[in-house]
Amino acid sequence: PPIDRKIMRYAERGSRARRMMAKEYRHRAIVWGVQPQYCIDMLNWMVHCWGIVPLTDMLSLVNTRMIADTDTPENREQAFYDMAWLNENMIMRNRTHGGYKVLVDDLWEFCETMHADMVIMWEHMSCKALTGMHGQFEEQARARGIHLVWVCHDLCDPRVYTRQAIRDQLNAYMRTVMREEPLDPSIEVLPDENAW
C-alpha cells in the first residue's frame, strides 16, 4: 500500500541521517509476554524516558518462515497448509502454552541473536503459564547476566494496574536495581486521565 512506502521512506531517511530516537541508547531489550491492551505507548516511552530500545516483541515472533506471496495454483493449495501451521503456532498457544522450549529457551536464543542485555517481561496477572515459570526465568536470566524486569498488568482492565502503575514498575527497577536516572525526567510520570 502507498502508506507503507511513505513510512518506509521516512524510516530510510532517518536511518541515512543516523537520527536517533532518544539522546542516548542504554539498553537493548527483548519484550516478552503479552502486553496490556490499554498501554500501547510503553515501548516508545521506554526509549525516551530510560534509553531502553525494544528490539522485538514476543507478539511479532509468530512466524520466522516464508509463506507464499505469489498467486499460483500450487501456492493456493499451500495456503491451506500455511494457515493451518499459523493457527497451530499462534502466540498464546505457541509461546505461553507451547512448552518450555518455545517459552523459555527461545527467549534466550533471541537475546543472544539480538545482543539484548535486558528483557521486559509482561506478566499478565491471570496468566498461569508465565507465573508458573517465574523462577525459571529469574534463574536463567541471572546465569546469563541479563536484566529481567517483571511488569505486572491486567490484560484488558486499566483499573487494576493503571498506565502509570505499569510505568512505575519500570521506573522503580531502573532507579533501584540499575541505579540510573531517566534521560527525560519530565516524562517519568505522565497524566493519563485523558488516555482512553
Model-derived features: where do they sit?
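A charged, amphipathic alpha-helical module
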Residues: 1-68, 96
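Cap/lid and interdomain-hinge subdomains that line or gate substrate/regulatory clefts
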Residues: 1-21, 175-196
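Domain-level signal for soluble alpha/beta catalytic cores
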Residues: 22, 28-30, 60-68, 165-168, ...
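Hydrophobic alpha/beta core scaffold segments
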Residues: 47-51, 71, 75-78, 91, ...
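Conserved N-terminal ligand/cofactor-binding loop architecture of enzyme catalytic domains
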Residues: 57, 62-89
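Active-site cores of enzymes that catalyze phosphoryl transfer or operate on phosphate-rich substrates
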Residues: 81-98, 106, 194-195
